[in-house]
Amino acid sequence: MIVGEDQLWGRRALEFVDSVERLEAPALISRFESLIASCGFTAYIMAGLPSRNAGLPELTLANGWPRDWFDLYVSENFSAVDPVPRHGATTVHPFVWSDAPYDRDRDPAAHRVMTRAAEFGLVEGYCIPLHYDDGSAAISMAGKDPDLSPAARGAMQLVSIYAHSRLRALSRPKPIRRNRLTPRECEILQWAAQGKTAWEISVILCITERTVKFHLIEAARKLDAANRTAAVAKALTLGLIRL
């Protein structure tokens, strides 16, 4: 049986979605790039929409733009006049780049951005806006002649949403659970914060110095601290111990 184009794109997208939660960032990005490339998209970017308070570099989650284009885009502050992210901020619907509204005569700066993009092989593109409680973002992909059929666009939307969500989750700092340290570890860190040596703590608590050192090492490991001093500092910051 010959698989139709719609079914093919649907299958590829679902296979990607099924694998997302098992992938770490490098493997996820590699699979995402491979999938969009099969659709004719040779470049992409996943980023928050720039604002007065934050520029594109610090908002970028994954950058697949040509290096020279990204550098030019940032140095020329193209995000301030680019019709694609401008339109993305006002809609929840994915759209083709050429459908982003602007007037060539009244908005020559916007036209210049699109013209310069084409010089880097980014002739036509597809943008998927995403709006979260903490801000807006977009996945924008482009190429010289990408497949923009409804089936391909639907697949690109689906994989982009899942890829962005997974990368956002992976980029968040892993929270330290307040209850990870045992009462004994907290007690020993409390004494360490007061400047007591391992031997002095062992005398105070009537345990061996070796046991004290073991608990200090375990506490540092759980707090992702490089040494005893860093562990004490982090425990104080988290409110696990007090001076």
From Swiss-Prot:
DNA-binding region: 198-217
Protein name: HTH-type quorum sensing-dependent transcriptional regulator RpaR
One biological process term in Gene Ontology: regulation of DNA-templated transcription
Domain of life: Bacteria
Disulfide bond entries: none
GO MF term (any one): DNA binding
Family named by the database record: Belongs to the autoinducer-regulated transcriptional regulatory protein family.
Function: Responds to the quorum-sensing autoinducer 4-coumaroyl-homoserine lactone to regulate expression of several genes. Represses expression of rpaI in the absence of the inducer.
Sorted UniProt keywords: DNA-binding, Quorum sensing, Repressor, Transcription, Transcription regulation
InterPro entries: Sig_transdc_resp-reg_C-effctor, TF_LuxR_autoind-bd_dom, TF_LuxR_autoind-bd_dom_sf, Tscrpt_reg_LuxR_C, WH-like_DNA-bd_sf
Residues covered by the HTH luxR-type domain: 174-239
